[in-house]
């Protein structure tokens, strides 16, 4: 028995089954499983990564999405470790302080490196780092602290080189971190968002979403949530933070792509429910279906 699940990474495959009848072109978003035929005309294509030839046809060896590059067919796995690219915005956790660099966990195969020379020191200094700065590295960033950084370079072994030489990057405090599969993060030109609810969100390309209050005296674009002194967060702001975090988890649990539009749509449609109800299966499944339907409608209108 063979079956085919269609749908872009925008929503979960099981939702797309009931919505794909009106779609005409579904080849580019076809999801395959091991042993499943990749294409209908194998003689016109060459096999690539994640495929093999069986009885004259190209068959998938992985569970993932079919990708085509000219005449080359490949299968890209849906769930995989984060593989960074230059320019990616990531939310990382410092795991070790070494000589002239910090080791950071970015949910990749290897820990990323943050060199001392690639850090903007407190006060906004762009000066040359000296021995005194190296001795104070553990004061700048400690083990377990969260940072927002940008991928500057990808080395030959896959190690990511980070930098925070910009005011919008740096240490993160007073917020909520939600981990999601990296493939659910939709790439965009902007990953720093100030929401109209008095919140700010950093959607990291590595699958880490940071929710923090947008403080009135500063903006996220100006200081990147550099908080050197803890400030009192009002109860209503905390409730909003928890609701946004619950919305991110709902999108994650139902495999809906996470970006600004999907997050704001989920937040607005969740208003009739209490926050604790968003974790209940009946409420969350019904809400996820409505969110997916609206996002699909908006996508079709854009086309």
Curated annotation (Swiss-Prot):
CDD domains: KH-I_Rrp4_eukar, S1_Rrp4. Residues 175-213 form the KH domain. Ubiquitously expressed. Its main location: nucleus. It comes from the Eukaryota. GO terms for biological process: CUT catabolic process; exonucleolytic trimming to generate mature 3'-end of 5.8S rRNA from tricistronic rRNA transcript (SSU-rRNA, 5.8S rRNA, LSU-rRNA); nuclear polyadenylation-dependent rRNA catabolic process; nuclear-transcribed mRNA catabolic process; poly(A)-dependent snoRNA 3'-end processing; TRAMP-dependent tRNA surveillance pathway; U4 snRNA 3'-end processing. Component of the RNA exosome complex. Belongs to the RRP4 family. This is Exosome complex component RRP4 homolog. The gene is exos-2.
């Amino acid at each position: 028995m063979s079956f085919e699940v269609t749908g872009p990474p925008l929503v979960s495959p099981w939702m797309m089954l009931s919505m794909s009848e009106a779609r005409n072109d579904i080849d580019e978003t076809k999801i395959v499983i091991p042993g499943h035929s990749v294409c209908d005309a194998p003689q016109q294509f060459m096999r690539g990564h994640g495929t093999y030839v069986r009885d004259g046809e190209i068959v998938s060896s992985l569970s993932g999405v079919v990708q085509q590059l000219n005449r080359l067919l490949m299968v890209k796995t849906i769930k995989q470790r984060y593989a960074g690219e230059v320019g990616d915005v990531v939310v990382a956790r410092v795991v070790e302080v070494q000589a002239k660099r910090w080791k950071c966990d970015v949910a990749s195969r290897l820990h990323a490196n943050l060199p001392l020379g690639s850090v903007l020191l407190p006060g906004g200094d762009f000066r040359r780092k000296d021995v005194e700065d190296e001795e104070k590295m553990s004061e700048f960033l400690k083990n377990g602290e969260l940072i927002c950084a940008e991928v500057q370079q990808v080395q030959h072994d896959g190690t990511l080189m980070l930098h925070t030489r910009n005011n919008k990057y740096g240490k993160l405090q007073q917020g909520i971190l939600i981990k999601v599969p990296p493939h659910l993060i939709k790439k965009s030109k902007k990953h720093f968002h100030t929401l109209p609810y008095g919140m700010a969100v950093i959607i990291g390309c590595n699958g880490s979403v940071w929710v923090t209050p947008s403080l009135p005296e500063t903006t996220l674009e100006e200081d990147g949530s550099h908080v050197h002194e803890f400030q009192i967060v009002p109860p209503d702001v905390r409730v909003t933070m928890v609701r946004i975090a619950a919305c991110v988890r709902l999108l994650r649990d139902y495999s809906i792509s996470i970006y600004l539009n999907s997050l704001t749509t989920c937040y607005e449609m969740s208003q009739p429910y209490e926050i604790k109800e968003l974790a209940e299966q009946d409420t969350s499944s019904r809400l996820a279906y409505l969110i997916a339907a609206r996002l699909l409608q908006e996508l079709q209108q854009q086309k």
